[in-house]
């Protein structure tokens, strides 16, 4: 049990607000507990929107967490600035200026794995066009809708058509699949595992999604 009583802000009036103030030992404890829950830090791709803090991202990196999910381009930059070797912008982009900025970030960190989620042919089109104009290759992940109904292609011909569109674009590389099952709130691990397995089984029925090119293997 971590005691909270010893924590006091020595000079409250000297603290400029708003500011994020945390119990550092609790943050460290929670990061370690999360790694234990999933069998090791290497099995995690953590979402930075819960803290939006480069300092906490560095703590996560220090224990071996390598993958980071981001909701905004600024979060993506933050994770990469902290040293993340792999990061995905989990919300698809359609605005050209955002895609241009994503391309800039990808070019700056071309020694990392930086992905954009795509869930619709329009996302593929704008990314492919801008990447081609810049003579640049951009990495993407196919965003799949497994029941949240917020973003992503359906687990049917939508997904296979999207996957085919990516392969048809010379300036894009498909780095894998992205799924968010936020509609499921099972507390029981066995129920969570069963739901996840159903999604895996559904994916196996989609022809073409398991055909990985040599470029994709090396991304």
Name each model-derived stretch.
Residues 2-7, 26-56:
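N-terminal glycine-rich anion-binding loops that anchor highly charged ligand groups
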Residues 3-22:
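Generic N-terminal amphipathic, Lys/Arg-enriched alpha-helix
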Residues 14-15, 28, 98-100:
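Expand to "…catalyze enediolate/carbanion chemistry for C-C bond making/breaking, isomerization
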Residues 16, 23, 116, 155, ...:
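Residue-level preference for long, well-ordered alpha-helices that form the structural scaffold
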Residues 25-33, 161, 198, 202-205:
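A non-catalytic, amphipathic alpha-helix used as a structural packing/dimerization or gating element
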Residues 37-42, 168-173, 205-218:
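A structural motif corresponding to the C-terminal end of an alpha-helix
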Residues 47-186:
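Active-site-proximal beta-alpha core segment in soluble small-molecule metabolic enzymes
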Residues 187-219:
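C-terminal active-site-proximal or functional interface alpha/beta core segments in diverse enzymes
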């Amino acid at each position: 049990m971590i005691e909270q009583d010893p924590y006091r802000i020595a000079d409250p009036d000297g603290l400029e607000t708003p500011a994020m103030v945390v119990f550092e030992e609790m943050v460290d404890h929670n990061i370690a507990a999360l790694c234990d829950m999933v069998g090791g830090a290497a099995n995690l791709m953590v979402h930075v929107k819960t803290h939006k803090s480069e300092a906490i991202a560095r703590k996560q990196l220090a224990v071996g967490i390598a993958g980071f999910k981001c909701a905004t381009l600024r979060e993506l930059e933050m994770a990469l600035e902290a040293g993340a070797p792999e990061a995905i912008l989990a919300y698809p982009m359609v605005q050209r200026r955002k895609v241009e900025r994503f391309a800039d970030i990808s070019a700056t960190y071309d020694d990392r794995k930086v992905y954009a989620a795509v869930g619709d042919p329009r996302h593929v089109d704008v990314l492919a066009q801008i990447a081609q104009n810049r003579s640049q290759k951009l990495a993407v992940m196919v965003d799949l809708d497994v029941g949240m109904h917020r973003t992503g292609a359906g687990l049917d011909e939508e997904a296979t058509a999207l996957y085919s569109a990516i392969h048809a674009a010379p300036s894009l590389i498909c780095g894998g699949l992205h799924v968010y099952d936020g509609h499921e709130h099972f507390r029981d691990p066995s129920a969570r595992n069963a739901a996840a397995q159903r999604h895996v089984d559904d994916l196996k029925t989609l022809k073409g999604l398991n055909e990985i090119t040599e470029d994709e293997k090396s991304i």
